[in-house]
Amino acid sequence: MRLSTSAIALCVGLLVARGAAAVELPQRWVSAGGALSEWVSALGAQARLVGVDTTSQHPESLKALPSIGYQRQLSAEGILSLSPQILIGTEEMGPPPVLSQIRSAGVQVELFSAQPDLPTLQNTLQRLGRLLGSEAQATALFDGYQQQLVQQQAWVSQAQTTAKAPGVLLLLGHAGGKPLIAGKDTAADWLLQQAGGRNLATHSGYKPFSVESLAGLTPDVLVFSDRALTGDAAREALFKQNPILASTPAAKTGRVLELDPTLLVGGLGPRLPQSLVKLSAGFYPAESAKATAAQ
């Protein structure tokens, strides 16, 4: 059977259209959000990144890329000097006039939600998958992520059959000074809940820590994230700058845990499930020890 000229033309047109669509995918990316940069890398597209913001610290190789500064205080000149085709970030990215200037220069600007929940993450990965031409890989990443969380929740449920959920406060600071208490509707709150903790903070967002804010609260566990220091130096700075914390049950029993602050930026990132395992072990040390001994 011979194909008509019109049929052949249609087939050729479809092939050309598909090829053009593939070619038109943005190849030069700038990312202003730690979690988004990590997901782009996890999708095998780190080579497309030509610039990242200061919250993009993982994987380590991202630190070699040009920095565009802090995600909330971007400069159009700095970003445009990298000749990007696309700029991605969360709704925290700004300021708005800078984003408008970047759009006017012909750069595609894509905003993602930083809401810490699975439906939002699924949407984020689907969009990134389409923009990168890696939709199947994005779906597989989300499915694997979700499975890790299911396993984590099963472990927490088992641990809570013999131990109650600890009361927890999460403090985010800079060299120990003026820490913020993580409240509801934050990635930190999501982390604490998923790890099996009970966030004692009842406010929304982040609230400055004070002696008054600690009144009536008796945290079993303190979790701290420091943007400037790590390890023992961060812990010592926290208690030196905020001596009232030494009176908490958490400090007296040594249940003070450190959390990488980059995990709290830009929504749910790929390293969160592993961090949940570590937090849960700190929340339920006896149960964690039993599980380790049984292995």
Describe the role of every protein-language-model region.
Residues M1-I8:
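Bacterial N-terminal signal peptides that target proteins for export
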Residues V16-G19:
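N-terminal signal peptide c-region/cleavage motif recognized by signal peptidases
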Residues V23-R28, P97-G176, R198-S204, K252-Q295:
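Extracytoplasmic substrate-binding proteins
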Residues Q27-M93, V98:
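A short, structured surface patch at a secondary-structure boundary
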Residues G33, E91-E92, A114, S204, ...:
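Short secondary-structure boundary segments
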Residues D53, A182-K207, D226, E258:
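His/Asp/Glu-enriched short active-site or ligand-binding loop at hydrolase and phosphoryl-transfer sites
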Residues A76-S83, S210-T218:
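Short helices/loops that flank or line small-molecule/ion binding pockets
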Residues P95-S104, F224-K240:
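A ligand-binding cleft/hinge motif common to bilobed small-molecule-binding domains
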